[in-house]
Structure formats: structure tokens, C-alpha cells
């Protein structure tokens, strides 16, 4: 490879990082500083985002998108297959680690849960525009449902019932945003302007607030106490999962913005939500927090290269 080719590639990656990732980390830095200097409680900010802003975002994106039922169905199928692949890869990788049950639950949880909300949605918008955001939102919705069903089942390791996990779906506000959007589209009845304007304002606030929550969560990270286990989980999440996602996206038939957004979302670092589940069910919370922090901090190296690939091959 010629030196000029290497220089061009480096310039491309730097340009992608500056335009698509640096804004996210700049806003996350603000959240980190707020949590570190004036003690803003992440739980309060997270709940405002989760219960008020995220449903408005999902509603606004879906009613203004051109997604049809087939496209949405393919994205949900893609998410299901990606999650299954992540689970199987994590289960195999855990064998030589000889983990106890709580540690195994934590290990599976961090590998199957990607940060498709706080991190994935803003990056999808910056890298692939409104079309990419629409598909990324479908992935985010599916992952939100999983967090309160499969995620809880994994974390609980049999201590909670299936019924309790299913009831948890009702606690996902984004579901109501999606249902309202579906009803509006089905009936061909858009919201009156007096209602749509506040929804749009809340929607516009969602992505910046999600990133601030991400930064506040990073401020709580501690030094890993199980480096081999942490390293294995991080490699699975941000190195091997992108490769698996590319293959699965082709198998499902995703194309264009759907392919870009789907692969990007599946390749995000570990979801912040896993720290909440780990604390709730006492499954290696320090390990989970370490994986969230390290995978997020290293993700610009992998996500930048991935975006360059997706922009050239979709």
C-alpha cells in the first residue's frame, strides 16, 4: 500500500471521528463533569429521559419516517438473530473462564446488550441521517423490550418468574410511543399541531440527554477487578459482534440505510442499562460497570472504522 493511500485512509477515519463521534463524546464529557463536580444524580436525569423524552423521540421518528411493515419486521428479525448470536458466542467464550452463576449471568448480559439508545441513536443520526435514525430507532425499540424481558431473565438467573418479566414490558415508555405512532399511521390521523409541537420539542431534547446520561454513568466507573473476564467481554462486544452483524444483515436482506443502522447498532458498546440490572439482581455489578466503561472508551477505534466501511459498502 502506498504512503498516500495510508494518509488518505487516516484522514478519512479522522474526518469520521470528528464529524460523527466527537460530538457525542463532547456532550458525554459534559455529563461526566456535571456528575463529578456538582453531584447531579444520574437516576433523576435518566428517568426524565426514559419516561418523557424517549417515547417522544420514538413517536416523532416513526411518524415522520418512510418505514413500512416489511422493513420494520426485517429490523426486528435482525435484532433477534444478532442477540441470539451474541448469546451463543458469549456462552462459548465463558467456558474456559469457569464462571460461577452470578458471574456467568453478568457476562452474558454485557455481551448481548448493546448501547443502542444513549450512544447508537445519536451516532446513527450523525453518520446516516434521518433515514438511518428511523431504522436505528426500530432496533432501539426491540432492544428496550429485550432489556425488560430477556435481560431481566438473564440477570435474575431464575429468581424471577416469566410473568414478572412480561409485565416489565409495560414499564417501557418507548413502547407506548411506538404504539401511538402506529395508530396514527394506521388511521392516517396526524396529531394536531398543538400536540405535535411539544412532542417534537421533547424529541429534539432526547438524544442530547441520552448522551449526558452516558457521560454521567462513565463517571461512576471503577478499575476492573477481573481483567481477563472484562477483556473477553469487550472484545466480543465491539470487535466480534460487528463481524457477526454484517453477516446476519446480509442474511436477513437489510440494504441501504437499514443495513448501515442495523450493523452500527449491533456493534455499539455495552448498554448502560446493564449496570442497573446488575445492581438490582447483584450479579457482579463492578464487572458490569467496568465493561460498560471500557467498551465505551475503546469504541471510537472500532466504530470509526465501521462507519467508514458502511458508508462505502451500502
Language model features with spans:
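Alpha-helical transmembrane segments of multi-pass small-molecule/ion transporters
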Residues: 1-314
Amino acid at each position: 500500500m502506498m504512503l498516500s493511500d495510508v494518509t488518505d485512509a487516516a484522514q478519512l477515519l479522522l474526518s469520521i471521528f470528528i464529524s460523527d463521534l466527537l460530538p457525542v463524546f463532547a456532550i458525554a464529557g459534559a455529563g461526566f463533569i456535571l456528575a463529578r463536580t456538582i453531584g447531579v444524580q444520574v437516576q433523576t436525569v435518566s428517568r426524565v429521559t426514559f419516561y418523557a423524552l424517549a417515547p417522544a423521540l420514538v413517536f416523532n421518528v416513526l411518524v415522520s419516517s418512510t418505514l413500512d411493515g416489511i422493513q420494520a419486521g426485517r429490523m426486528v428479525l435482525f435484532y433477534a438473530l444478532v442477540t441470539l448470536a451474541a448469546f451463543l458466542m458469549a456462552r462459548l467464550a465463558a467456558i474456559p473462564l469457569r464462571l460461577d452463576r452470578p458471574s456467568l449471568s453478568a457476562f452474558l448480559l454485557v455481551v448481548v446488550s448493546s448501547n443502542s439508545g444513549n450512544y447508537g441513536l445519536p451516532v446513527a443520526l450523525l453518520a446516516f441521517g434521518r433515514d438511518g435514525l428511523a431504522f436505528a430507532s426500530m432496533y432501539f425499540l426491540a432492544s428496550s423490550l429485550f432489556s425488560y424481558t430477556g435481560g431481566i431473565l438473564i440477570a435474575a438467573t431464575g429468581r424471577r418468574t416469566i410473568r414478572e418479566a412480561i409485565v416489565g414490558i409495560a414499564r417501557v415508555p418507548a413502547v407506548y410511543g411506538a404504539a401511538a405512532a402506529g395508530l396514527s399511521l394506521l388511521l392516517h390521523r396526524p396529531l394536531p399541531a398543538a400536540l405535535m409541537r411539544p412532542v417534537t420539542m421533547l424529541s429534539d431534547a432526547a438524544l442530547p440527554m441520552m448522551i449526558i446520561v452516558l457521560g454521567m454513568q462513565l463517571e461512576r466507573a471503577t478499575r476492573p477487578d477481573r481483567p481477563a473476564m472484562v477483556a473477553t467481554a469487550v472484545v466480543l462486544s465491539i470487535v466480534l459482534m460487528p463481524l457477526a452483524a454484517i453477516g446476519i444483515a446480509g442474511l436477513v436482506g437489510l440494504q441501504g440505510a437499514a443495513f448501515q443502522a442495523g450493523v452500527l447498532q449491533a456493534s455499539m458498546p455495552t448498554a448502560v442499562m446493564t449496570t442497573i440490572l446488575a445492581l438490582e439482581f447483584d450479579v457482579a455489578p463492578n464487572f458490569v460497570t467496568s465493561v460498560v466503561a471500557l467498551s465505551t472508551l475503546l469504541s471510537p477505534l472500532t466504530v470509526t472504522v465501521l462507519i467508514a466501511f458502511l458508508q462505502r459498502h451500502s
